[in-house]
From Swiss-Prot:
<dbReference type="InterPro" id="IPR005762">
    <property type="entry name" value="MurD"/>
</dbReference>
<dbReference type="InterPro" id="IPR013221">
    <property type="entry name" value="Mur_ligase_cen"/>
</dbReference>
<keyword id="KW-0131">Cell cycle</keyword>
<dbReference type="GO" id="GO:0004326">
    <property type="term" value="F:tetrahydrofolylpolyglutamate synthase activity"/>
</dbReference>
<comment type="pathway">
    <text>Cell wall biogenesis; peptidoglycan biosynthesis.</text>
</comment>
<dbReference type="GO" id="GO:0008360">
    <property type="term" value="P:regulation of cell shape"/>
</dbReference>
<keyword id="KW-0961">Cell wall biogenesis/degradation</keyword>
<feature type="binding site">
    <location>
        <begin position="116"/>
        <end position="122"/>
    </location>
    <ligand>
        <name>ATP</name>
    </ligand>
</feature>
<comment type="function">
    <text>Cell wall formation. Catalyzes the addition of glutamate to the nucleotide precursor UDP-N-acetylmuramoyl-L-alanine (UMA).</text>
</comment>
<keyword id="KW-0573">Peptidoglycan synthesis</keyword>
<keyword id="KW-0133">Cell shape</keyword>
<dbReference type="InterPro" id="IPR018109">
    <property type="entry name" value="Folylpolyglutamate_synth_CS"/>
</dbReference>
<keyword id="KW-0132">Cell division</keyword>
<dbReference type="InterPro" id="IPR036615">
    <property type="entry name" value="Mur_ligase_C_dom_sf"/>
</dbReference>
<dbReference type="InterPro" id="IPR036291">
    <property type="entry name" value="NAD(P)-bd_dom_sf"/>
</dbReference>
<keyword id="KW-0067">ATP-binding</keyword>
<keyword id="KW-0547">Nucleotide-binding</keyword>
């Protein structure tokens, strides 16, 4: 990405991980003079090898009056980090790589921003997948995979995943479409309060021409009702929605709006939930329709068991479990948001549906690895909070649940109503004692030394069952007590599965 605005300007970059190095690369190619630093010596040493012309000087020695901007990596908290205080003392603009990208893109290039506590990576990828299948030149990145400044310069549409860390840094946002999927407590240690966390998410929809907002979540439903811009509600629950609704057909030929407001407030409201997205009517009666029934199994059709006629209604189309490669329960909200975004962009319904059917999903997200004897193995390492784990637990029954790590606010108390699905829990990490207290007298559990110990014990226990068992790694916790990230945790689980499968195959030869 060409950042011509910063040609011959002095720009400071702090935080020399993937995002910071991406910013240095783009700024250097654009003719900026770079001053780079990091809190960690090894990061500085690595950057020095890559960018020998940069000035690697401690920020306390900068002439801040000559610095045009400080580009801050999302891993660096704005409060109370010393570099932020230093820059503010000299009224230096603090920017994120996303802001540099939005400044540099051309006016005819569309940007879709996706955020939410859960589901944003899958939604971002699915939108990109469908747009590519529709023949659009698409670039996908941000918090997911490729930093935005490394994306192709000539894309028609950019689909960007935005985390709360990235949004926190942003002062100005201007995107064509935003998708806010849900908000539940997360990253409170970074943001200081739930109110601050919510405020980061609001930045995105407030800076968008059209906002797609999930309304099955109390917080985001409230945001939807108060938001006065052009907005689209999505829902996958039975609960009737208290929103004015029009059909997507009424918007088919309507271009993206150039303003957010009309005289009467919101331009129109488009509902994907007029007749409820998820249809369980053939299988379920008399349940609490505010949420899925914890006594009913919503199993993946690949298992060959459970309810197989669950369908997702999207206008005149219906998707069943067997139609898609991804877990329908876990991804219903993601699919609904994707459908809305693609319709606003003018993609026809058949192309969207075919794209949903052909999408293979992402690693570590309710990922069915395979079966050994009577035991299925599911890698849901991305589930770093209770709400995310809830969707996985609702997808299976007879579960040996591997859970734990660095706990988020609220822990797993909200999952107690689903403990009937869990035959035994195998607890790991810092949260072990707290999770054990919640499970006491409700579900059997064992405290494990580590993931390897939990994997071994869960499999040994499952072999004692005459029924099929699912070993589910869905930690409901961050990974940072034992791993670099959720990917590393998930890869370790996958290696354990592959080693076990190899050993059992050898035994059968």
């Amino acid at each position: 990405m060409q950042l011509n605005k910063y040609k011959n300007q002095n720009v400071a970059v702090f935080g020399l991980g993937k995002t910071g190095l991406s910013a240095i690369n783009a700024l250097t190619k654009s003719g900026a003079r770079i001053y780079a630093w990091d809190d960690h010596e090894e990061q500085i040493a690595n950057a020095k090898m890559m960018y020998k012309k940069c000035n690697f000087i401690h920020p306390k020695e900068y002439n801040w009056h000559e610095i045009s901007a400080l580009v801050l990596s999302p891993g660096v908290p704005t409060e109370p980090h010393w570099i932020v205080k230093l820059a503010r003392r000299f009224d230096c603009k603090i920017k994120s790589d996303i802001e540099l990208f939005l400044e540099a893109k051309t006016t005819n290039q569309k940007v879709i921003g996706v955020t939410g506590t859960n589901g944003k990576s899958t939604t971002t990828s699915l939108i990109g997948h469908i747009l590519k299948s529709a023949g659009k030149k698409v670039a996908i990145g941000g918090n997911l995979g490729v930093p935005v400044l490394d994306l192709e310069r000539d894309a028609e549409i950019y689909v960007i995943e935005l985390s709360s860390f990235q949004l926190e840094l942003m002062n100005e946002i201007n995107v064509d479409i935003s998708a806010l999927l849900n908000i539940t407590p997360d990253h409170i240690d970074r943001h200081g309060s739930m109110e601050n966390y919510i405020a980061t998410k609001l930045k995105l929809i407030n800076g968008s021409e059209v906002a797609v907002i999930g309304c099955d979540n109390e917080i985001t439903a409230d945001i939807f009702n108060k938001f006065t811009g052009d907005k689209i509600p999505i829902s996958v629950t039975y609960s009737p929605m208290s929103f004015q609704c029009v059909t997507l057909e009424s918007r088919k030929e309507k271009p993206l709006p150039t303003t957010q407001m009309t005289e009467g407030g919101a331009r129109d409201l488009i509902s994907l939930a007029g007749n409820n997205l998820l249809d369980y009517s053939e299988q379920i009666t008399g349940i609490d329709r505010n949420y899925l029934d914890p006594s009913v199994s919503y199993l993946d059709d690949k298992r060959g068991t459970g309810i197989q006629k669950i369908s997702l209604k999207l206008e005149n189309h219906s998707l069943s479990v067997s139609d898609v490669k991804i877990n329908l329960i876990s991804n219903a909200e993601n699919i609904a948001a994707t459908y809305a975004v693609c319709k606003v962009l003018g993609v026809d319904s058949n192309t969207i549906i075919n794209g949903i059917k052909s999408f293979s999903g992402l690693r570590h997200r309710n990922e069915l690895l395979g079966k050994i004897r009577n035991v299925f193995f599911v890698n849901d390492s991305k589930a770093t909070n209770a709400k995310s784990s809830e969707k996985a637990i609702l997808s299976y029954e007879n579960i040996n649940w591997i859970a734990g790590g660095r706990s988020k606010k609220g822990g797993i108390e909200s999952l107690s109503k689903h403990f009937t699905r869990v035959r035994k829990a195998f607890l790991i990490g810092e949260s072990t004692e707290a999770f054990a207290n919640v499970m006491e007298n409700k579900v059997d559990y064992v405290k494990c030394c580590n993931l390897e110990d939990a994997f071994r014990l869960a499999f040994e226990e499952a072999l004692n069952s005459a029924e099929e068992v699912t070993i589910l790694l869905s930690p409901a916790c961050a990974s940072f007590d034992q791993w670099k990230n959720f990917e590393e945790r998930g890869e370790a689980f996958c290696r354990m599965f592959e080693n076990l499968r190899y050993n059992h195959t050898c035994c059968l030869v």
